[in-house]
Structures are given as structure tokens and as C-alpha cells.
Amino acid sequence: MTDAPLFWRSEDLPRWHAWQRAQWPLTRRAADTARSTVRGVAGVLTHRRSTGDDAPRLLLPAGDVHTLVALESFGPTQLAALASPVAALATARPEVAAGVGWVLPAGDAPALPGAAGHREHAATADVVRDRLSGLRRVLVAGEYLPSGRAAVRWARQRGARIGVVQHGLLAVSTPPVPQDATLYAFTSTDADWWTQGRADVEAVPVGSALLEQARRTAPALSGAGDDGPGVFLGQLHGAELPRRDFAAAAEQYVRATGAAYRPHPAERDRLSRGQHAAWRRAGVRIDDAGAPLVATRGPVAAVFSTGILEAAQAGRPAWAVHPDPPAWLEGFWRRYGMTRWRPGRTPEPTSPLASPTADPAAAIAAHVWKETA
């Protein structure tokens, strides 16, 4: 397989969903089918008038809403990509930021920029009709998860503009950019790779707010990269490669270097927990304290985690690891300038990713809200 996306046309989204579901363990697919059946029966029996239990929530100002920002989680990648541009807007043009609403997933939301006086609403048909009549634009990570899917649907119903912010590194199975969108990409190379020349997408290379935040922490982390054996960032949950590949890469690195294995937050399934337990019995250190990457010490390695570039931006040694990488993964490493680690060698660390702009969040804000709200 070459380094090209599997799903780059907007009409490929159903294929992406089918592919994603096919990667789930059989038990998860069975549970999902059962839940869907129960929900369908419940909907028929109760004739629900709401948008459903899984509908995202709306956090809206008292006045007009000209922009919706859709969060799929409250994790650092989503907040850096989607909340930091609003923070930049609130600093530069607070009167415009006052009209920004939010589409929220389940869970307790952190303090969001410009939203101190906002109120939460269920996304019922009445609320959507009455409160979003003046919607002019939405900002999303994509339309493949609930918040972004709802925001894009509402935008299309109202003829509003759709802005897509790249929030992570682009692997071969990345879902497609929505139709007729403006894409705020990390680099022009990423934009070209992701869209494959699509005429309906306007690409604006801006850089990564997450990586810029990592770069700005570098002075406070002097010496962090040389202190101890470091960490290997887990990705056992990933669908892009077989689980055995992620495990083999981790074992190769931690056994050679003494690094700790740092599970991804999504590694909560039975198979992942079993793998962690087996590694512990074999003497591998498992760093499951949940502290942010910036709080760790020493070099950073992974198969293709964004954490490799976060570490590089902060001046820490960082490498990519896979015993026998497929062609698409080697292309991925080249696209981001990731240096491959091999046993018995000391390669040059991965270099920081060059950014097209000095302040990605401010660049996104300036382009998204370049017109009067």
C-alpha cells in the first residue's frame, strides 16, 4: 500500500464508517448491534420527539449565534485545534467571540473561551430551529463523529460555511474532508495528501496549535530529553495496523532501552489490559499515571503518535518504531520527518515540524472570522 489516503472523496465517508466498524473486535460489534436494535425499538415504541439520547449538547450565548464550534471530546488535541482559535478571537475581537456557540459531547466541559455566560441546551429540533437561524459558519474536526456530523448538517441546511481544522497526524485511514469545506491543515503537504486535488476544498496551511504549544514549553523543559530511558507511547487501540504490530514495536523498543510503556487513554479494552498485565509480569514498566506527556522525562518513541512531534517540538529526542513498517507507514514517517529507530543504532532525533505560520490558532481565527460576524 502506498502513502495515499484510503478515503479522500467526501462520498467515501460511508465506506470509512464501514471500514472503521470492521476493525472493531467481534464482541464490540455484537454489543453495538444490540444497542442499535434496542434504541430502534425504543424509538418506535415511545415516538421520541427529541433528537435522541446520543444527540450532542449545545452551549449557546444569550444573543445571536453566528458560529458553532464542534468538539468531539475535551482532550488536548481537540481543544488545541478548535478551542484555541476561539481563544485567539476572544483576545483580538471579544465582541465577535461573544457570538460563538459550542457543540459538546457527553461529559463535564472545561471552561471554554468566551463562554462564561453561555447556557447549555439540548439539541432539540425547536432549539436548533430557533437559536441557529443566523448561523453563518461552523468549525469542526470532520463530520465522522456526532458533534461534527450535527454541526455540518445544520450548516448545510442554512447555507453556512464549513471550516475543518486538522487536529492530528494523517494516517492512511483518515476520514475524508467534508464537501465544500475550507481545510486548515498543518502543512501544504498534508493538505495535498488529504484532499488529493479536490476542487471543492479550499486548503489553508496554518500549522498545529498543539505543536506550537509544545514548542513554547521547551525552555521550561531544559534537560528533559536526557533524563532517563523515556517512554514508548502506546497505540494498541489503533485500527490502522494489527494489534500485534503495535505490541511488537513497543516490545522491541522498551526491551532495548528500558523505557516505560505509556498506554493510550483508549487502551481500556480487555485485550489491551491483558497485554499490559503480561508486560508487567515480564518486567516492563507501565506508566499509567495519566500525567501529560510534558510531565515525563527522557526520549519519546511510538509507531506514529502525534507525541513524537510534540516531543521534537519541545527539544526532546523522539523516534518512530516498527520492526517491519508497511509502505504507507514509511510514507507517513517521511511526510512528518520522523526518524526511524532501530535496535543497536543511535539515529538522529526527529526534527521539529516547520509551521507555515508563527501562531496557528491566531491564523485560523483571522481567516475564519475575516469578515464581520
Ranges and model annotations:
Residues 1-23, 334-373:
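C-terminal amphipathic helix plus adjacent low-complexity
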Residues 205, 306-359:
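Catalytic binding pocket for nucleotide-activated donors in carbohydrate/polymer assembly enzymes
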Residues 172-177, 193-196, 213-218, 294-295, ...:
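Short, charged, surface-exposed secondary-structure boundary motifs
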Residues 267-314, 318-319, 324:
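Donor nucleotide-activated moiety binding/catalytic core segment of transferases
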Residues 20-56, 166-167, 176-241, 265:
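A nucleotide-sugar donor-handling region in carbohydrate enzymes
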Residues 2-9, 14, 45, 49-199, ...:
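Active-site and donor-binding regions of nucleotide-sugar-utilizing enzymes
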Residues 73-79, 109, 144-147, 236-242, ...:
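Short acidic, S/G/P-rich loop/turn micro-motifs used as interaction or catalytic elements
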Residues 78-85, 209-278:
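Conserved catalytic-core segment of nucleotide-activated headgroup transferases in glycan assembly
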